[in-house]
Amino acid sequence: MSGISIQSGAACATPSATDVEGVPARTWQGPSAPERLAILRRARSIAIVGASTNPARASYFVSTYLLSSAPYDVYFVNPRATTILGQPAYASLADLPVVPDIVDVFRRDADLPGVAREAVEVGAKALWLQLGSWNEEAAAIAEDGGLDVVMDRCVKIEHARFHGGLHLAGFNTGEITSRKQRVSARR
């Protein structure tokens, strides 16, 4: 278990300074909730990079939600697939028939800077890295290219929480709620 030790029989302990050596500190500051809502409201199309044909994958679950419960034109990017959920799959962002407003990424960390460069090259408006994805190099590439950036957030959860749909996934923890929030966004 990554070198974190539990002291004095405690069930949970904070890591010591030596436990987190070599782990880069998060310095990038992401958009606020109203800013994320504005990104979602401005968007008309979303490209899902790393979309999967496997129903057990998070990208598949997010894709089904976006197709059934969100107003976006959804495009799938996966060079190994021909169709996903009955829609064509494309080998790259450059192969899409439109420039996507949001590039939603389900790829491993090492691939994120390259996806950010590709999003800038095609003229996308936002780079969205899913839950668990945090890459400051990719964020810098995208921001330097004029894109909005969201990291470590699920586009499905964010859309659902702003539109009262979290109950569809069973979320109601108090931190993320199924109740509609009144958030004003600048357009």
Give short role names for the model-derived ranges.
Residues 26-32, 83-113:
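Glycine-rich, highly charged phosphate/nucleotide-binding loops
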Residues 2-23:
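Helix-enriched interaction subdomains in cytosolic or periplasmic regions
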Residues 136-159:
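Short acidic, glycine/proline-enriched helix-loop-strand junctions
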Residues 47-49:
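Conserved beta-strand elements of the Class I
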Residues 52-57, 64-84:
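NAD(P)-binding Rossmann-fold cofactor-contacting core
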